[in-house]
Amino acid sequence: MTNWQGKNVTVAGLGVSGIPAARVLHGLGAVVTVVNDGDDERSRAQAADLEALGITVRLGDGATLPEGTELIVTTPGWQPDKPLFAAAAEAGVPVWGDVELAWRLRGPGSAPWLAVTGTNGKTTTVQMLASILTAAGLRTAAVGNIGVSLLDAVLGEETYDVLAVELSSYQLHWAPSLRAHSATVLNIAPDHLDWHGSMEAYTADKGRIYEGNRVACVYNVADKATEDLVRAADVEEGCRAVGFTLGTPGPSQLGVVEGILVDRAFVEDRQKNAQELAEVADVHPPAPHNIANALAAAALARAFGVPASAVRDGLRAFRPDAHRIAHVADVDGVTYIDDSKATNTHAAEASLAAYGSIVWIAGGLAKGASFDELVAKSAQRLRGVVLIGADRALIREALARHAPEVPVVDLDRTDTGAMPAAVQEARRLAVAGDTVLLAPACASMDMFANYNKRGDAFAEAVRGLGA
């Protein structure tokens, strides 16, 4: 669709991507109708702003396909089994996401995309990648789920040499035309299964990121599912499979040798040679899963032709966002770490693996997850556990099965005041040399607006210990 004038487009959902999409489409000359399930005060205020522009908004009815619709542009949160999409399929109306819209609106000579997805580590990897690209002197931005919106990056006045793009499984589901320069799936673990319907569907949507890649499909050697997705992808001729590993890399891989990040993929005679990129100490923090993120970012940057020195300089300059394995304080010889971003079992497992003797604060909304494997793998590291949140019983039961000797404090409350109580209980269980780790393995919305608020509450409670 290149001529938007007079096209009838329905935007499914208000919010951070729906509203910008509606504005952009209206500006292109489309006849835009926004449909939204909710009809609350916030939705009505958003609707009023759009209606002032001449955009039609229909609140409280997101199920009915507006008459004459030629295209639906959906926000990522709308599940594929929504009645609206069934009606669209029956009527032969295509459905795009905001990523698909941005991809289709790119102009001639637009910046190529280096794309990142995975169950965990997406944001950190994209930010590392942007830091490396910047160190190489390239005009770039971290876009997608973070930083600049994709629509702004594609349509804005600022020009870029290359974009570092974070993509969720939701976004990839609705982006059939996306063709990245190079891409990576960092890891695959059960998450968002309520949205996708099955692990198979979730994995398949992640794998869409490799379709049509031109230069490199970067996979995790330790996660065979990611390599399987590369093998299944239909890519351009000459596109290479490149692995990253925390071990010694083979040919066409990046890895670690004696504390050095090395490249055996983007070098001459990769059967015999390796290029030093950076030291493990250049990665902040140097936890194993974060080193893996750095290797993936380095692989994408190297695929774009970035020199080794820029990888080193970019990693040295990078600092992670708050609530990602963030050091809060040391109190009475105990280290307090905020990893509130660990909202699923895979992320929590990586966080727990980075420390020795741990008092673990966990719980929240489980999103259908099982905790048996997580607890079984982490049991030997646990000094004690403090449970909070709506689904804490699921973790308690897994602890009873796989770590019955570990002391567990079950806080039977879901108000925000539970966090100071949890920190006090963790302090009581911990001894000098231990780490008190907030790695909830669950979503936060039962108690907090988001994981940031949860992490803030933890940090505030910890700082109160030293007062």
From Swiss-Prot:
Keyword Cytoplasm recorded: yes
E.C. numbers: 6.3.2.9
Native source organism of the sequence: Streptomyces avermitilis (strain ATCC 31267 / DSM 46492 / JCM 5070 / NBRC 14893 / NCIMB 12804 / NRRL 8165 / MA-4680)
GO MF annotation list: ATP binding; tetrahydrofolylpolyglutamate synthase activity; UDP-N-acetylmuramoylalanine-D-glutamate ligase activity
Catalytic class of the enzyme: ligase
Top-rank taxon, per record: Bacteria
GO cellular component labels: cytoplasm
Enzymatic reactions: UDP-N-acetyl-alpha-D-muramoyl-L-alanine + D-glutamate + ATP = UDP-N-acetyl-alpha-D-muramoyl-L-alanyl-D-glutamate + ADP + phosphate + H(+)
GO biological processes: cell division; cell wall organization; peptidoglycan biosynthetic process; regulation of cell shape
Name of the protein this chain belongs to: UDP-N-acetylmuramoylalanine--D-glutamate ligase
PANTHER family for this protein: UDP-N-ACETYLMURAMOYLALANINE--D-GLUTAMATE LIGASE
